[in-house]
């Protein structure tokens, strides 16, 4: 089976055929760097990182571009409220976002363009649209004329043209309330850049069209982003890009939200879980597991029990790989089972793929119990390869390179506890239950609870 992806534009599963053989080009809408990143922000970046890893595993040369929106109304407002320059505020939070992606194991993007670094490309795109009759200037603003492209507008989102309303009233200079802003005229005290139509700053939609085609060409393979971006952002991107003559994206992918109490996680609602805060409660790979284990098009309803379940599941993988390494020596990389490949080719069905991982662990633990170290090592090597595709390989250098002080402490603890549990398992195998119980009691005295499961012993830190 070859890779099939759910395409938002056609609302169907489509077989992936890249524009250029052996090359995959991906543009992902990144963050508006207005504040501290939360788990809802980073979910999409992790999902598209898994897509990238799967494509690389299958031999593709992948070029992934993720933008940074570093000029926006919210950035200006928050910077002013904090008494800081807007650019300083944006830069600080851009670093926070990149640190979050790095700590959660995202491969660095091929390019990480900032909106403010591509004003020239935006001006060129606006000029093309004006020349073709699809945009117009009014009072220093520049607008896209939806009526001029009515036959094609709405094909991504399914939005009816007679229901479209794009915010500002016609009093702002718009000819039609459906038209959307490409360029905003300068206001006193705000940053601005010169254009043939007056000083100002870019509109949100214009930025992504200019940057994606600049780095990936006028037509590229996959455009990704959150479900909330389908309309108006991606609809407007598609309209302005194709109206200008670009082929633009061949496939559209959208990841679902992280919610809390049924509502999308959002700073405006005050229901977010910040990355720095959650990293105090769980190790980085455990958080990544929590966010990539569900299907990317399925909503994640955040709860502490669900997070705890994900932590336990990842620790089973971590404990297993380290148990095999301690027992059999170095664990390399192995083959990918057909069931895992089939799951990943089916629109990145990570729940099924992870089920294959846990099945392999159960079989390998059985091999260890019967003394078949060779089979156990081969299975562990396969588990390493599967988890590496998901960005979850417990032995990956990415965790050593990105681990902060808290993660380093957890890793050291994991190694020590794993060694003690191996001693306990050996004692139980030799029916030396007194020694096994003594090891368990020592761990419990240190605040570590041990649970014997079909996948092997699982340890957790006790509350309090």
From Swiss-Prot:
GO biological process: cysteinyl-tRNA aminoacylation
Main location group: cytoplasm
Binding site for ATP: 267
Cofactor: binding comment: Binds 1 zinc ion per subunit.
Obligatory cofactor(s): Zn(2+)
Class of enzymatic activity (EC top level): ligase
Enzyme Commission number(s) of this protein: 6.1.1.16
Motif ('KMSKS' region): 264-268
GO CC annotation: cytosol
Example of a GO MF term: cysteine-tRNA ligase activity
Annotated protein name in UniProt: Cysteine--tRNA ligase
Keywords: Aminoacyl-tRNA synthetase, ATP-binding, Cytoplasm, Ligase, Metal-binding, Nucleotide-binding, Protein biosynthesis, Zinc
Annotated spans, Disordered: 160-180
Binding of Zn(2+), residues: 29, 208, 233, 237
The organism of origin for this protein: Saccharopolyspora erythraea (strain ATCC 11635 / DSM 40517 / JCM 4748 / NBRC 13426 / NCIMB 8594 / NRRL 2338)
Localization, UniProt: Cytoplasm
